[in-house]
Amino acid sequence: MENILHATPAHVSLPESFVFASDKVPPATKAVVSLPIIDLSCGRDEVRRSILEAGKELGFFQVVNHGVSKQVMRDMEGMCEQFFHLPAADKASLYSEERHKPNRLFSGATYDTGGEKYWRDCLRLACPFPVDDSINEWPDTPKGLRDVIEKFTSQTRDVGKELLRLLCEGMGIQADYFEGDLSGGNVILNINHYPSCPNPDKALGQPPHCDRNLITLLLPGAVNGLEVSYKGDWIKVDPAPNAFVVNFGQQLEVVTNGLLKSIEHRAMTNSALARTSVATFIMPTQECLIGPAKEFLSKENPPCYRTTMFRDFMRIYNVVKLGSSLNLTTNLKNVQKEI
């Protein structure tokens, strides 16, 4: 627990192990960008067209009127804030540096992949459906946390699956293509906490990376910090009220043979305010074979990616070292070559 950032006194200066060279943390453009906002209560034809257009252009978009109630969203945000303010002793049993442990509290302070560490603490939970007895493996404090997590994850999962159906309709493939093993793995919940940082210009909450799953929904919280790679620059994201920020994972890129891209993004820190966000990852099962769908292949458009078992992809992804660009995956095709 001594590595947990939020459990230690506020730092007056940034420890050397967290300092990145300036060329590794290029500043974002000054403009703050509002990602495309898609109202899921609009007509279905309009919604699926908007999702596909936004996905092709930026790989990121926002959804509103998505079906997750404002109360559920506020309850989740409130519970997460309370969790990170609990005394260290109440969280000690959750702390683990074992990456393969499904439910754990960990810190970027223990990651030394590229020589530097990351200014983030994270509570990661595996959420199978139906939840059943798995709920007993989640934290039970603050009181009511388990029920809030179950309700939030169930509703967010439903939104993710509906977005996948809309994408299928927009691309002209079978609407239930992503049902079953492709989206049937445990939903992974990352509750990220970025404490206030004494020198945010030289630190990273998370390095540039692409998500390894199918599709991700982010509850971004009240403090901005997400930045997205776009046309060679980093753009700051200004989330809309009560919206989820959505991005495509690498498995969606593989299935669509590159039609939809998984885009690099990073998390920055703030000198005055702590930031808490909640990422919901829709995952394939570990045994799922994932490759380009035949609907996206032709003589003129051969497969760009191999068909691999998701378990093998995850195994290689977890050991890929950071390159000079700080891209955790370096290149999706290169990761596949190692399998």
Curated annotation (Swiss-Prot):
Gene3D superfamilies (alphabetical): B-lactam Antibiotic, Isopenicillin N Synthase, Chain
Residues that, per the record, bind 2-oxoglutarate: R275
Cited PROSITE patterns: FE2OG_OXY
Principal cellular location given in the protein's record: cytoplasm
Keyword Transmembrane helix: no
Cofactor: binding details: Binds 1 Fe(2+) ion per subunit.
Induction description: Up-regulated by iron deficiency and down-regulated by iron. Not induced by anaerobic conditions.
Annotated residues for binding of Fe cation: H209, D211, H265
Localisation: Cytoplasm
UniProt-listed Enzyme Commission number(s): 1.14.11.24
GO BP of this protein: response to iron(III) ion
Family stated for the protein in its record: Belongs to the iron/ascorbate-dependent oxidoreductase family.
Protein name: 2'-deoxymugineic-acid 2'-dioxygenase
